[in-house]
């Protein structure tokens, strides 16, 4: 396992976007091993809200700010389409989020002091493909 050393504190995080990616992140058990706890997910689709998914709750967006403030959540995960990502980012920051793990394929404009890590799945796969081709070409 590749986890960064932590101080044994567990950092709570939330996910916005409870589609396939959001649900996969919500139920992934490996975050606990790295000192992370996903406390809830949020979505605009009321069909998926209020359900229990893998022992975690999917809540309506109107509950996001209260939960973040009450639980002092400082990490937000964005798993929404690109066209919604900036508005979600702004809401997360308004709710006290200080660090964002962004899965939307878009650059987020954030104030100074807010940490953003962009996870570009397409670029990661393209890099892996390129490395495979280089390895294959080197062996022929």
Stretches with model-predicted labels:
Residues 50-139:
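Phosphate-bearing ligand-interacting subdomains
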Residues 2-4:
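Short, small-residue-biased leader/transition segments that mark boundaries at the very start
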């Amino acid at each position: 396992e590749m986890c960064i050393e932590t101080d044994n504190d567990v950092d709570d995080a939330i996910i916005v976007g409870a589609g396939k990616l959001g649900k996969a992140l919500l139920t992934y058990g490996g975050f606990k091993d790295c000192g992370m706890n996903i406390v809830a997910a949020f979505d605009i689709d009321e069909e998926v809200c209020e359900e229990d998914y893998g022992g975690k709750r999917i809540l309506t967006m109107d509950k996001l700010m209260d939960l973040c403030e009450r639980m002092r959540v400082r990490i937000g995960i964005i798993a929404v389409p690109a066209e919604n990502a900036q508005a979600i980012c702004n809401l997360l920051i308004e709710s006290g989020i200080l660090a964002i793990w962004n899965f939307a394929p878009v650059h987020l404009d954030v104030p100074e002091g807010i940490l953003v890590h962009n996870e570009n799945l397409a670029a990661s796969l393209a890099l892996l493909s390129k490395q495979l081709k280089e390895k294959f070409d080197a062996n022929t």
